[in-house]
């Protein structure tokens, strides 16, 4: 269930405000230099209000696009929540993108503001955008640039969320662009309900889980199910700023006694390649593993099932529609190795012909 109604909903309310006052941790952050921080929903409420008020002060309107070119840091999450709070649309920019990929996405989406950091900032030197907000901007700022915290801390910590409808967009995604120019994929607010359903039925996210999604929030799986989905359930998320490595991933899994893990087959194949690093203590807390992106290999499945004593399940989705078919951890149905599973509750799938008519069993569509 969402707190909002079809004609009065806001993703910030669903993913933060509704949990303010419950004294729950929302974000666990592991910094690239060994720092660790924990942010409560109450702290994110204050920080996102201040940033949202700055957005309004520079003329950002309901329905405008704000892009985040940021690593996995607290500022990224604050930017997302502040964007949603004022009824604007958040656009992720993967930090490995070069300037041309950024420019194409920004121009296509008519993005009004890019939030970035000092490390990523040089990529924007030749990108046309009205406003740039930089974390640790320094002193040599462009005429259209401001410093993230310097501006945010000057603002009020009160900001009323703007209510929208289910069909209004709250994310501006793009396809991967592997077969040509990346195409825009606007995501409506009603998708939050589907994201919650996936977390509950397929991932089986429970209140007492320690949850970590390995995927980068610059892409759909990390943003939909590493941020939006779990936060909409009032569940804490782990953000790890470091570049992925098996050694560090094992450290995080052990440090936070991760019980519910999601990621890509690529990451899980890397785990299998260094399986000697997974000591028996991990068996005592790792309960469920979900994989998305491409099929798992039999040897990886066998290793998780038999050596780590945990079920790892294939699941399927796309940027354009989210995760829609899965072997569900929380549902009692047959799990067949090599199969993507069954449609998520609330979904039905069929093969169509060239005229978009459903074909019969055995026919090619």
Q: Could you tell me what each predicted segment is?
A:
Residues 193-210, 217-260, 274-275:
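Conserved AMP-binding/adenylation subdomain of ANL enzymes
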Residues 23-25, 134, 153-174, 181, ...:
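Conserved pre-ATP/AMP-binding loop-to-beta segment of ANL
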Residues 27-81, 98-103, 148-150, 187-190:
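Conserved AMP-binding/adenylate-forming core of the ANL superfamily
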Residues 37-42, 170-194:
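Conserved AMP-binding A3 loop
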Residues 57, 78-151:
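Structural core segment of the AMP-binding/adenylate-forming
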Residues 350-365:
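Conserved beta-loop-beta connector loops within the AMP-binding
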Residues 48-51, 166, 185-206, 268-272:
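Conserved structural elements of the adenylate-forming
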């Amino acid at each position: 269930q969402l707190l909002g109604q079809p004609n009065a909903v806001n993703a910030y309310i669903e993913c933060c405000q509704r949990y303010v006052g419950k004294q729950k941790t929302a974000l666990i952050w592991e910094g690239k230099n060994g720092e660790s921080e924990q942010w409560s929903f109450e702290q994110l409420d204050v920080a996102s209000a201040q940033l949202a008020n700055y957005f309004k002060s520079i003329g950002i309107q309901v329905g405008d696009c704000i892009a985040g070119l940021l690593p996995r840091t607290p500022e990224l999450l604050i930017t997302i929540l502040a964007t949603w709070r004022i009824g604007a649309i958040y656009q992720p920019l993967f930090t490995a993108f070069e300037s041309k990929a950024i420019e194409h996405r920004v121009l296509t989406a008519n993005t009004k503001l890019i939030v970035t950091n000092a490390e990523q900032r040089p990529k924007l030197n030749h990108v046309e955008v009205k406003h740039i907000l930089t974390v640790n901007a320094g002193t040599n700022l462009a005429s259209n640039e401001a410093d993230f915290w310097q501006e945010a801390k000057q603002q009020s910590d009160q900001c009323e969320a703007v209510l929208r409808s289910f069909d209004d967009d709250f994310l501006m995604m793009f396809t991967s662009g592997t077969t040509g120019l990346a195409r825009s994929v606007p995501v409506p607010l009603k998708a939050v309900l589907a994201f919650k359903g996936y977390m509950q039925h397929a991932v089986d996210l429970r209140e007492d889980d320690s949850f970590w999604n390995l995927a980068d929030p610059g892409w759909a799986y990390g943003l939909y199910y590493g941020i939006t989905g779990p936060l909409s359930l009032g569940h804490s998320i782990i953000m790890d700023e470091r570049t992925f490595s098996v050694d560090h991933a094992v450290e995080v899994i052990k440090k936070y006694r991760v019980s519910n893990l999601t990621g890509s087959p690529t990451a899980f194949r890397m785990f299998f390649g260094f399986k000697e690093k997974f000591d028996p203590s991990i068996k005592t807390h790792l309960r469920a593993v979900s994989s998305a992106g491409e099929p798992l290999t039999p040897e990886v499945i066998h290793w998780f099932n038999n050596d780590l004593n945990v079920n790892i399940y294939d699941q399927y989705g796309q940027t354009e529609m989210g995760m829609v078919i899965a072997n569900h951890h929380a549902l009692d149905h047959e799990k067949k190795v090599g199969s993507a599973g069954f449609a998520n509750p609330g979904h039905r799938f069929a093969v169509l012909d060239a005229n978009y008519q459903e074909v019969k069993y055995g026919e090619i569509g």
